[in-house]
UniProtKB/Swiss-Prot annotation:
Organism: Pseudoalteromonas translucida (strain TAC 125)
Function: Together with its co-chaperonin GroES, plays an essential role in assisting protein folding. The GroEL-GroES system forms a nano-cage that allows encapsulation of the non-native substrate proteins and provides a physical environment optimized to promote and accelerate protein folding.
Family, as annotated: Belongs to the chaperonin (HSP60) family.
Keywords, in A-Z order: ATP-binding, Chaperone, Cytoplasm, Isomerase, Nucleotide-binding
Assembly description: Forms a cylinder of 14 subunits composed of two heptameric rings stacked back-to-back. Interacts with the co-chaperonin GroES.
Binding positions for ATP per the UniProt entry: 30-33, 51, 87-91, 416, 480-482, 496
GO BP annotation list: protein refolding
NCBIfam families according to UniProt: GroEL (TIGR02348), PRK00013.1 (NF000592), PRK12849.1 (NF009487), PRK12850.1 (NF009488), PRK12851.1 (NF009489)
Main location: cytoplasm
Pfam families found in the cross-reference section: Cpn60_TCP1 (PF00118)
A single GO molecular function term of this UniProt record: ATP-dependent protein folding chaperone
Superkingdom in the source lineage: Bacteria
GO cellular component: cytoplasm
Protein's name in the database: Chaperonin GroEL
Gene behind the chain: groEL
Length: 547
């Protein structure tokens, strides 16, 4: 086991704080409508220019092990916020940096770290309740477009196209994907399709490694209502598909052992392009969903219950689709070859079942199935002049899409950092059990001003002046950093999803609290890989006389 270096107390916290500040300072310049770009070097190809906080955070790795630990913990804040709400990574990073800096000052002054953490936790819980009270539902297309616009760094075109996509495929149940377009303009395509929450059974099926996805064009789709473990059952189908030179997607109850291993080997050798996923749902619901996919793709479910055997399956039993995209978590079938009359009949059948259903859960699941059959998939094609611009714009569209989904889910609050300032101003009378907890509460409340300060700083204005002006107002009154005006944020269309702001605050408070209570850090001592000493060559000095 390699030797370790251990740092304690102030030394450990100082190193950790350096790492926190390096990462946070690189991320926070992207915040707000006038946020700056960050250029990321890539080992091949042109550098990437981005205003996406989580993309910047992911690139940062520091040489000093202890500083790197601090940076990685803040990276965790950004990535947790991104996973929970799909946006708010920069806000979460700014909040965490402020809490850690102020908290560690208090620890250095002799306060109890555990009490500080309890105070911070208390303030965060109270602030989340205030944010929920401030929240208003996001129900109309205009509000959805405004949320998308703000999240895409004030790009109105992106906000509008996302609102259109949601209008066409449904706000709650519709599936929206983002792709690279072929033109300079953003385009919206609505394609008949279905998405379900089952990913590839083996990462060896991946054929688009940069995205980590499996993409199959014009595949055959084999639907099987049982577990497949014996490859012999699949051989006739595989041979028929190989002759047709088309890819194959297998959707079955499960695939294991020899069958899965053989498919992986065939795929890697290029004999037949194949991928496999588990069928969605469980029990009777799985049977129904397999039947939905069969109707959508024009295939037949191979089920022994109706006398069909897998070994006797023919190409006629297989469904087809224009495209299938499989990630580690879900599968999207685009433009299935099923007949419209069959799909409409199936939708009517599900509608009738919804009317008869007694439990809310059953109704919800049936509505999901109907949306997947009837709603289709909206594809936003991002247009740009160069590859660099394309990557940057695609990041922003994905952020904006996540933000609008979060807004539909939990509503919206006034944007531009105002909601956090309002929540903090309502909590000035909040007290803890002792003086150190009170200070922890103050640390959290002061941190809640940090996102607004950073937005104003990035816009080139004086943060303290703006903070005081916003605090003097009430309700939705705030500062529009894009135009330099003060007004009602919701009327100006500056909205943040409640879920994004709430998640950012909760994750920042949680991880920053852990950092404040750190008392020791352990890291491996780096090996010295310098070249060995060439001491034996010293005797060659006498060659000087040969001149």
């Amino acid at each position: 086991m390699a030797a370790k270096e251990v740092l304690f107390a102030g030394d450990a916290r100082a190193k950790m704080l350096t790492g926190v500040n390096i990462l946070a300072n690189a991320v926070k310049v992207t915040l707000g409508p006038k946020g700056r770009n960050v250029v990321l070097d890539k080992s091949f190809g042109s550098p990437v220019i981005t205003k996406d906080g989580v993309s910047v955070a992911k690139e940062i790795e520091l040489e000093d092990k202890f500083e790197n630990m601090g940076a990685q913990m803040v990276k965790e804040v950004a990535s947790k916020a991104n996973d929970a709400a799909g946006d708010g990574t920069t806000t979460a990073t700014v909040l965490a940096q402020s809490i850690v800096n102020e908290g560690l000052k208090a620890v250095a002054a002799g306060m109890n770290p555990m009490d500080l953490k309890r105070g911070i936790d208390k303030a965060v819980i109270a602030a989340v309740a205030e944010l929920k009270a401030l929240s208003v539902p996001c129900s109309d297309t205009k509000a959805i477009a405004q949320v998308g616009t703000i999240s895409a760094n004030s790009d109105k075109e992106i906000g509008d196209i996302i609102a259109q996509a949601m209008e066409k495929v449904g706000r709650n149940s519709g599936v929206i994907t983002v792709e690279e377009g072929q033109s300079l303009e953003n385009e919206l395509d609505v394609v008949e399709g279905m998405q379900f929450d089952r990913g590839y059974l083996s990462p060896y099926f991946i054929n688009s490694p940069e995205k980590g996805t499996v993409e199959l064009d014009n595949p055959f789709i084999l639907l099987v209502d049982k577990k497949i473990s014996n490859i012999r059952e699949l051989l006739p189908t595989l041979e028929a598909v190989a002759k047709a030179s088309k890819p194959l997607l297998i959707i079955a109850e499960d695939l294991e052992g020899e069958a899965l291993a053989t498919l992986v080997v065939n795929n890697m050798r290029g004999i037949v392009k194949v991928s496999a996923v588990k069928a969605p749902g469980f029990g009777d619901r799985r049977k129904a969903m397999l039947q939905d996919i069969a109707v959508l793709t024009g295939g037949t479910v191979i089920s022994e219950e109706i006398g069909l055997e897998l070994e006797k399956a023919t190409v006629e039993d297989l469904g087809t689709a224009k495209r299938v995209i499989i990630t580690k978590d879900d599968t999207t079938i685009i433009d299935g070859a099923g007949e419209e009359a069959g799909i409409n009949g199936r939708v009517s059948q599900i509608k009738a079942q919804i009317e008869e259903a007694t439990s809310d859960y059953d109704k919800e699941k049936l509505q999901e199935r109907m949306a997947k059959l009837a709603g289709g998939v909206a594809v936003i094609k991002v247009g740009a002049a160069t590859e660099m611009e394309m990557k940057e714009k695609k990041d922003r569209v994905e952020d904006a899409l996540n933000a609008t989904r979060a807004a539909v889910e939990e509503g919206v609050v006034p944007g531009g950092g105002v909601a956090l300032v309002r929540a903090a101003s309502k909590l000035v009378d909040l007290v803890g059990d002792n003086e150190d907890q009170n200070h922890g509460i103050k640390v959290a409340l002061r941190a809640m001003e940090a996102p607004l300060r950073q937005i104003v700083t990035n816009a080139g204005d004086e943060a303290s002046v703006v903070i005081n002006a916003v605090k003097a107002g009430s309700g939705n009154f705030g500062y529009n950093a894009a135009t330099g005006e003060y007004n009602d944020m919701i009327e100006m269309g500056i909205l943040d999803p409640t879920k994004v702001t709430r998640s950012a605050l909760q994750f920042a408070g949680s991880i920053a609290g852990l950092m404040i209570t750190t008392e020791a850090m352990v890291a491996e001592i780096p090996k010295d890989d310098s070249a060995p000493d060439m001491g034996g060559m010293g005797g060659m000095g006498g060659m000087g006389g040969m001149m």
